[in-house]
C-alpha cells in the first residue's frame, strides 16, 4: 500500500489519531483519541478530483427514502462530551444525526458504516480542517430582546432556556414567563426565531392551581426567584407540582437570608432534583455561603458567565449590574447593602476553581441581566484555559493533551443543561438519533466565532461575505441568517419544548404553532451523578468573615489572570 507522511495526510484529510490541535490562542491542546473511519486510503472527500463522485464515493442507486444521507460532514474532528475527541464522517438525514463513522459507497469502499451511505441525495461539508461540536444550550436566559437570538447563534448556542416577556422590570431580573396569557404570547412570538426554546413559568406560588395552569399553557419548567419570594414554602410547593408533572425547577435563592439560610433552602428541597442558578452567589442567592449547594447529590449547580473566568475587572463591574437588573436605587442604603452583599472576591475566584474540579456542572449566560448571551461557549473555553495556567494539568488528563479538561467544559454548555431540562434525549451531544443542531469551528476561532451553525441539519447561521461578490468569502464578512432561518424551514428545524401536560392538551393546535413541539421528560430522576464529567461532590466551607472558600479542607483560590485568551486578538471593541 502506498504510504504518505503524516504532514501530507493532515494537509489532505486533516488530523488523525495522535495529532494535536491547539484551540485558538489558548494553551489548550486536544489530541484525537480514535478514528472512526475504519481504514486509511479510502477517505470520502468532496471537490474537484476528489472521491465524492458518482460510482466512486457516491452510490448510484440508493434513494433518500431508502436511506441515502441528506448531508455528510467529512473527515471532521469531533469534540463532544459523550464521544470524546474523535475523527469521523458524520451523517445527517431528515434533520437527525444518523451516526459517526465511515461514510461513502459500500459498493466501492471498505468499512462504510451502516446508514452512512452517500449518493445523489447527499450534500457535503468538508470538515477536514474543522472542529464539530454539539450546538450549545444556554440554561439561564432572560427573554429581554428577541435580538438575543442573533448573539447566541453567533457563539454556537442553538437552544435557549429561560423566561420573560421583553424589557419589563420583572424580566430584567427574573427568567420567568408568568401566567397562561404571557406564555401563549411568547410561544406565538418565538415562532419566527431560528433557535430552540424552553420557557420557564413562575414557580413562586404556594398555591397549586396557578402553577398547573402555567404547565398546561406551555411552560417547560419552573423558576423560583428571590425577587418574588424564594421561601421554603414556595420551594416545596413548586417542587411538589414539578414531581407530579415531570418538569425541572430552577431556583435563585434568598440573598438576604430573610426566610432562612442556605441550610433551610437545602432542607426545603427534601432531596428532590433542583437546578441552582449562579451557585456562587454574585448573581444572587444566600450570602455568603450559597456555594455549599454544590456538595449535594440532588442539586444540579450552574453559574453564569460574567464572572468566568474571574479576571482583574470581574468584581468591579458587578455592582452596577446588580443595581440595574434588580430595580435597586443607589440612593437607598439598604439597596446598596443588598448589592454589595453579593459581590465577594473570594467566592468569585472559588467559582472558577470549582468549575475546574467538576463541582459546578453547567454554565449559562444570565443574558442582559448581568451576563452576555453571545459569550457562553467563549467563557467556558476561556475558563478552561485560565484554570490550566493557574492550576496545571488535571489528574484525569493524559500526558500531553487537555482532552478531559476541554470535554469537561464542553459538557457544561451542551449535554448537562440538556439533561437538567429534560431534553437530553433530543439535543446536547453528537449521537445517533438526536436533532442535528451542530456547530463547525475553525480551530483558530474555537469557542469564539463559529464558521457554520446547523439547526435541524440545515445551515441557519454563518459567517458570510458580500452576497454580491463572486465568491462567499469577500469582505465584509459577518454573521447572517441562512436558509434554515427563513420561511417554513425555520419551523421544521427549530424546537419549542413544553411540558408533557401542555403537549397532551394540544398546545400546538390551541395556539396555532407551526414549529416542532416536543415534551420534556425524565427531569425528576436527574441528580448530580448524571452530570457528565461534572459530578464531583465536595465538602464546602465558607468563612463568614473573610469569605474564603475551602473545598474538602483546602483553600480554593487562584490569582485572577491579568490577560485572558480568546479575547482582544479576536474582537475590535
UniProtKB/Swiss-Prot annotation:
Cellular component GO terms held in the UniProt record: cytoplasm
One biological process term in Gene Ontology: urea catabolic process
Active site, UniProt feature: 326 (proton donor)
Catalyzed reactions: urea + 2 H2O + H(+) = hydrogencarbonate + 2 NH4(+)
InterPro entries in the record: Amidohydro-rel, Metal-dep_hydrolase_composite, Metal_Hydrolase, Rhodanese-like_dom, Urease_alpha_N_dom, Urease_alpha_subunit, Urease_AS, Urease_asu
Residues noted as binding substrate in the record, renumbered to the chain: 225
Superkingdom of source: Bacteria
Alphabetized Pfam families for the sequence: Amidohydro_1, Urease_alpha
Domain Urease: 135-573
PTM comment, free text: Carboxylation allows a single lysine to coordinate two nickel ions.
CDD domains in alphabetical order: Urease_alpha
UniProt GO MF annotations: nickel cation binding; urease activity
Family the UniProt entry places it in: Belongs to the metallo-dependent hydrolases superfamily. Urease alpha subunit family.
Protein name: Urease subunit alpha 2
Species this protein is from: Brucella melitensis biotype 1 (strain ATCC 23456 / CCUG 17765 / NCTC 10094 / 16M)
Lineage of the species this protein comes from: Bacteria, Pseudomonadati, Pseudomonadota, Alphaproteobacteria, Hyphomicrobiales
Chain's gene name: ureC2
Amino acid at each position: 500500500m502506498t504510504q504518505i507522511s503524516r504532514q501530507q495526510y493532515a494537509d489532505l484529510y486533516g488530523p488523525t489519531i495522535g495529532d494535536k490541535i491547539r484551540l485558538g490562542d489558548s494553551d489548550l491542546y486536544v489530541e484525537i483519541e480514535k478514528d472512526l473511519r475504519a481504514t486509511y486510503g479510502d477517505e470520502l472527500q468532496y471537490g474537484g478530483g476528489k472521491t465524492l463522485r458518482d460510482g466512486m464515493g457516491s452510490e448510484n442507486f440508493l434513494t433518500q427514502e431508502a436511506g441515502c444521507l441528506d448531508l455528510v460532514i467529512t473527515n471532521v474532528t469531533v469534540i463532544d462530551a459523550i464521544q470524546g475527541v474523535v475523527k469521523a464522517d458524520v451523517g445527517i438525514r431528515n434533520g437527525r444525526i444518523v451516526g459517526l463513522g465511515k461514510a461513502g459507497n459500500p459498493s466501492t469502499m471498505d468499512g462504510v458504516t451502516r446508514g452512512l451511505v452517500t449518493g445523489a441525495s447527499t450534500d457535503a461539508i468538508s470538515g477536514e480542517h474543522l472542529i464539530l461540536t454539539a450546538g450549545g444550550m444556554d440554561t439561564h436566559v432572560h427573554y429581554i430582546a428577541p435580538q438575543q437570538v442573533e448573539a447566541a447563534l453567533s457563539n454556537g448556542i442553538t437552544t435557549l432556556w429561560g423566561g420573560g416577556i421583553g424589557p419589563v422590570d420583572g424580566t430584567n431580573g427574573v427568567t420567568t414567563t408568568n401566567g397562561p396569557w404571557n406564555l401563549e404570547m411568547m410561544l406565538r412570538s418565538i415562532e419566527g426565531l431560528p433557535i430552540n426554546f424552553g420557557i420557564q413559568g413562575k414557580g413562586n406560588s404556594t398555591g397549586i392551581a396557578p402553577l398547573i395552569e402555567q404547565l398546561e399553557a406551555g411552560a417547560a419548567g419552573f423558576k423560583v426567584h428571590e425577587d418574588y419570594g424564594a421561601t421554603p414554602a414556595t420551594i416545596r410547593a413548586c417542587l411538589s407540582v414539578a414531581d407530579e408533572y415531570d418538569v425541572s425547577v430552577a431556583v435563585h435563592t434568598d440573598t438576604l437570608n430573610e426566610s432562612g439560610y442556605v441550610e433551610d433552602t437545602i432542607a426545603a428541597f427534601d432531596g428532590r432534583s433542583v437546578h441552582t442558578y449562579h451557585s456562587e452567589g454574585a448573581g444572587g442567592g444566600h450570602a455568603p455561603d450559597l456555594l455549599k449547594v454544590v456538595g449535594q447529590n440532588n442539586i444540579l449547580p450552574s453559574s453564569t458567565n460574567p464572572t468566568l473566568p474571574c479576571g482583574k475587572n470581574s468584581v468591579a463591574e458587578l455592582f452596577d449590574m446588580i443595581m440595574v437588573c434588580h430595580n435597586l436605587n443607589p440612593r437607598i442604603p439598604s439597596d446598596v447593602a443588598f448589592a454589595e452583599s453579593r459581590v465577594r472576591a473570594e467566592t468569585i475566584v472559588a467559582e472558577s476553581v470549582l468549575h475546574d474540579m467538576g463541582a459546578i456542572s453547567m454554565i449559562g449566560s444570565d443574558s442582559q441581566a448581568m451576563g452576555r448571551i453571545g459569550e457562553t461557549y467563549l467563557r467556558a473555553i476561556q475558563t478552561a484555559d485560565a484554570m490550566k495556567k493557574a492550576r496545571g494539568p488535571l489528574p484525569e488528563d493524559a500526558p500531553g493533551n487537555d482532552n478531559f479538561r476541554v470535554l469537561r467544559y464542553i459538557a457544561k454548555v451542551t449535554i448537562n443543561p440538556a439533561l437538567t431540562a429534560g431534553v437530553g434525549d433530543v439535543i446536547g451531544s453528537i449521537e445517533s438519533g438526536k436533532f442535528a443542531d451542530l456547530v463547525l469551528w475553525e480551530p483558530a476561532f474555537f469557542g469564539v466565532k463559529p464558521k457554520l451553525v446547523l439547526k435541524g441539519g440545515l445551515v441557519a447561521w454563518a459567517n458570510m461575505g458580500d452576497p454580491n461578490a463572486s465568491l462567499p468569502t469577500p469582505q465584509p464578512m459577518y454573521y447572517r441568517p441562512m436558509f434554515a432561518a427563513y420561511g417554513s424551514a425555520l419551523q421544521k428545524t427549530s424546537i419549542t419544548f413544553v411540558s408533557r401536560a401542555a403537549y397532551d392538551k394540544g398546545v400546538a393546535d390551541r395556539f396555532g404553532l407551526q414549529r416542532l413541539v416536543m415534551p420534556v421528560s425524565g427531569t425528576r430522576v436527574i441528580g448530580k451523578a448524571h452530570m457528565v464529567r461534572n459530578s464531583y461532590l465536595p465538602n464546602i466551607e465558607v468563612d463568614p468573615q473573610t469569605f474564603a472558600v475551602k473545598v474538602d479542607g483546602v483553600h480554593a483560590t487562584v490569582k485572577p489572570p491579568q490577560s485572558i485568551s480568546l479575547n482582544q486578538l479576536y474582537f475590535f471593541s
